[in-house]
């Protein structure tokens, strides 16, 4: 009996002539994710991914947990393979699913026969194996409408496979197939979720954090490093760009009207993000903005913020309720880190009465006393780059 992981891709099915590009990217991402775990054979055939241990040291359970988080995979299941013979398939089903069959009060058999040369139809094989299983496990009965257990058989060109229920995986599209984007990673609940959601659409991420030491502590920096590390379970390796932001914020406080502090700060963030994007082949900027959540996230405020960049600004959380964002944060494992009580740069010099309905002209006038280019260049020159691996 050969134990393996059987994975089915998601939206790759919808692709046309460039389908192979997405498949190759998915296989490469899976191999990269498995490399720290052990040696595995990864094969893509007939729109399915097969993962087998290449030696005794390879941990298939650890591989299951890792691959389930790879974007581009819709479902994953443990399976076993055998020759394409009805009796071999029956024998495998009896042994491989013995515990599940013993525990179940009812079951049914479903067959997918992609190899049409197999001499039995899908229904015939299901009936044959189902009859044999019912005889071997008298504790259970056949129930084709609402069974406790579904025994799944797949007859493919290279072998036959037996498994039970497939589990939902990460879904989405393979990271890297839709280009790259700079993503703002603050340390709160929202930005890790927005980063996750854009990566799920196949985008390679370059995370950027604006650090305002000593107004924010080294613990705040460590918090963001932890969030980036947690995200790599889905995104793969990334290089975190830590931007020194203290001088910019001090200059804003010194020279600009208080009600515009946050808006001017965010305009600087956009300028710096655009510069980072240009040096990392990124075609967009990702933010965790949520319409109306805070004063800087009104339509007028966001228009002022985005006015300084030529890149598209992607806002995956823009219409979501906070509770839905929190739900995703819990699911992907970033919530507990996000709520650690370490402030980020967005809480430094917060205006008492922020402008909520600004115009671009007003904000441009408010920041006109600053040497914008010099401040941006200084910040970019001081960037600390930290590679984040799995």
Region locations from a protein language model:
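RNA-binding accessory domains that recognize and position tRNA/RNA substrates
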Residues: 1-182, 192-238, 307, 355-360, ...
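Active-site adenylate/phosphate-handling loop in enzymes that bind or generate adenylated species
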Residues: 131-133, 166, 172-178, 245, ...
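Structural beta-sheet core signal
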Residues: 183, 207-209, 242, 287, ...
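Conserved G/P- and acidic residue-centered "switch" motifs that form tight phosphate/ATP-binding loops
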Residues: 188
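A conserved beta-strand->alpha-helix junction
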Residues: 228-255, 344
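A short alpha-helix-loop-beta-strand transition element characteristic
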Residues: 333-341
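The feature marks non-catalytic terminal segments
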Residues: 340-390
């Amino acid at each position: 009996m050969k134990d393996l992981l059987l994975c089915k891709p998601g939206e790759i099915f919808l692709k046309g002539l460039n389908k192979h590009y997405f498949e190759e990217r998915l296989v490469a991402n899976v191999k990269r994710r498995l490399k720290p775990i052990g040696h595995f054979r990864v094969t893509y055939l007939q729109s399915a991914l097969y993962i087998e241990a290449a030696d005794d040291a390879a941990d298939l359970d650890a591989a299951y947990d890792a691959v389930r988080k790879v974007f581009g995979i819709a479902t994953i299941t443990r399976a076993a393979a055998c020759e394409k013979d009805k009796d071999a398939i029956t024998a495998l089903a009896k042994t491989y699913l013995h515990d599940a069959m013993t525990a179940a009060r009812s079951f049914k058999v479903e067959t997918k026969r992609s190899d049409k040369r197999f001499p039995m139809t899908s229904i015939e094989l299901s009936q044959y194996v189902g009859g044999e299983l019912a005889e071997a496990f008298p504790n259970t009965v056949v129930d084709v409408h609402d069974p406790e257990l579904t025994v799944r058989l797949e007859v493919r060109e290279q072998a036959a496979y037996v498994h039970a229920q497939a589990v939902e995986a990460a879904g989405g599209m393979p990271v890297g197939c839709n280009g790259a984007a700079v993503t703002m990673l603050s340390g709160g609940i929202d930005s890790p979720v927005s980063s996750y959601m854009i990566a799920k659409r196949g985008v390679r991420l370059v995370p950027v954090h604006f650090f305002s030491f000593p107004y924010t502590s080294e613990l705040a920096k460590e918090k963001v490093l932890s969030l980036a590390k947690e995200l790599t379970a889905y995104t793969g390796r990334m290089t975190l760009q830590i931007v020194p932001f203290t001088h910019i914020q001090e200059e804003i406080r010194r020279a600009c009207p208080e009600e515009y502090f946050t808006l001017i700060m965010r305009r600087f963030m956009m300028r710096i993000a655009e510069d980072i994007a240009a040096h990392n082949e990124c075609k967009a900027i990702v933010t965790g903005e949520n319409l109306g959540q805070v004063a800087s996230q009104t339509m007028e405020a966001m228009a002022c913020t985005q006015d300084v960049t030529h890149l598209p600004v992607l806002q995956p959380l823009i219409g979501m309720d906070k509770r839905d964002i929190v739900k995703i944060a819990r699911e992907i494992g970033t919530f507990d880190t996000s709520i650690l009580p370490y402030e980020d740069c967005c809480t430094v010099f917060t205006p008492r009465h922020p402008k909520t309905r600004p115009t671009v002209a007003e904000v441009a006038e408010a920041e006109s006393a600053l040497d914008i280019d010099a401040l941006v260049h200084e910040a970019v020159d001081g960037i600390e780059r930290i590679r984040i691996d799995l």
